[in-house]
Amino acid sequence: MNENTFEKTKIKICGIRDLEIAKICREEGADYIGLNFVPSSPRKISLKDAQKIVEFYRDTKNSPEIVLLFYQNSPEEIRTVTSSLYHDLIQWVWDDPKLTFVDRKNFLGKRQICSYRVNSPIYNEDLKNIPSELLILDSYSKDAGGGTGETFNWNFISRIERKFLLAGGLNSSNVSNAIRTVKPYGVDVASGVESSPGIKDSQKVIQFIRNVRLGL
């Protein structure tokens, strides 16, 4: 894999809760940031804090795309957030019990990212009915929609041809090997750039992004 591949790998920093980290993501060249509205998540952000980030990005050129993340939210909660905040994409979990197929297809917006949790080998056929612009292939956890800090067996996704972001247990130490091994369209990190659950570490964010770009 050549250096250009690393330079082109998309980077999503998920679970951002404060403006300073959002600024660092922009300065370092992240492609997406995730604002988490999952009720049970330590990364859940308030509408007020989310609005500060959104306003800064809208007033600043070359900002990352804004992704609003939902899991086990009611359709009413999703409506409230998406109607209140400017955003580029909505992220949802494929087996979210609170969303019907109609919700997923017609309600969530024009641009979507679907998170598919992997605990066994999957094939292109398994993903054909997912109506989203992008996929995130993430570790499976019974009670969490993501952000577990656990990797999964990358051989389980070795035959997937569709464009996807790799998630699950990534950090600055293993992300370059993950890119070389899996060759994803992009990478997605949450807990791997934190000092404690829900608290992003600025240096870890910077190191993660730079390691992706430099292939370190």
Curated annotation (Swiss-Prot):
UniProt entry tagged with the keyword ATP-binding: no
Enzyme Commission number(s) from the entry: 5.3.1.24
Keywords from the named record: Amino-acid biosynthesis, Aromatic amino acid biosynthesis, Isomerase, Tryptophan biosynthesis
Gene that this polypeptide is encoded by: trpF
GO MF annotation list: phosphoribosylanthranilate isomerase activity
Pathway entry: Amino-acid biosynthesis; L-tryptophan biosynthesis; L-tryptophan from chorismate: step 3/5
Family: Belongs to the TrpF family.
EC primary class: isomerase
Lineage, top ranks: Bacteria, Pseudomonadati, Spirochaetota, Spirochaetia, Leptospirales
Protein name (database record): N-(5'-phosphoribosyl)anthranilate isomerase
One of the GO BP terms on file: L-tryptophan biosynthetic process
InterPro entries for this protein: Aldolase_TIM, PRAI_dom, RibuloseP-bd_barrel, TrpF_fam
Reaction(s) catalysed (UniProt annotation): N-(5-phospho-beta-D-ribosyl)anthranilate = 1-(2-carboxyphenylamino)-1-deoxy-D-ribulose 5-phosphate
Cross-referenced HAMAP family: PRAI
